[in-house]
Amino acid sequence: DYSKGLKTLFESFNILFLKITTLIVKFIPLAVLCSMTSLVMLTGTETLLAIMSFFGTFVLALAVMLLAYCVLVFMIARLNPIILLKKHASAMMASFSLASSNAAMPFNIKSCHRLGISSRISSFSIPLGATVNMDGSCIYMAVAGLFLAKVFGVDMGGSELFSMVFSIIVLSIGAPGIPGAGLVCLSVLLTQIGVPAEALSLVMGIDSLLGMFRTAVNSAGDVAVSLIV
């Protein structure tokens, strides 16, 4: 009885924190609009051009990651990557629209079944991947961290880069699979590398869109690893 009560308590706290996080995320666009307007008025169109460059670099890095998944599937699983992308396309679209690794798990499991992966493997690998396989989040924090460090004139030496990589790995594994989690992890990373907190305003406006892209790539990674296993 005591263990059941404790379990219920922790589950209630988990639901409460998720609702609070979701509520905060809903009000972020308004704060971002005010912050971005002020920033553009102060710095001019150069800021918008820099953000567009950051977005392009991020999407290109995700495309390279997706290509790496396809190569691994072809070399190890001996499956045509086109078949993988074709059968997983609907799950990737669902992941893109949901922007949540946890919410996309049922779609990924169905995709595994279409690819002939046993339920015994997919029921273990997909939930595990939704927790620890955050390649998209790693890329996001790396690109955003370097971009913002450059914008604010923060020098990044070898030791700083090593510390940054280690922090990104830890933060990506510990990040919950919910919308907006990447932004919270990025704020922690920026604090560590010495970038001012106001730097977040540069990426807040497009974070939701970036979250969709990185979740779709995470989804492809989860299924690709399940296929290889």
Predicted regions and their residues:
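Transmembrane alpha-helical segments and their short flanking loops
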Residues: A142-V229
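Juxtamembrane helix-boundary/capping and inter-helix hinge elements in multi-pass membrane proteins
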Residues: Y2-K4, S12, T43, R78-I82, ...
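Membrane-water interface of transmembrane alpha-helices in multipass transporters/channels
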Residues: T45-S53, A77-A89, V154-S163, V195-L202
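Signature of multi-pass transmembrane helix bundles
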Residues: D1-I83
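Small-residue-enriched core segments of transmembrane alpha-helices in multipass membrane transport
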Residues: N14, M52-Y69, H88-A94, L161-A175, ...
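Helix-loop-helix junctions within the multi-pass membrane cores of secondary transporters/permeases
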Residues: A94-S172, S226
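Short amphipathic alpha-helical coupling elements at transmembrane boundaries
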Residues: T8-L23, A50, K86-A94, K110-R114, ...
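Hydrophobic, small-residue-rich transmembrane alpha-helices and their short perimembrane loops
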Residues: L84-K87, A91-A104, T131, E198-R214, ...
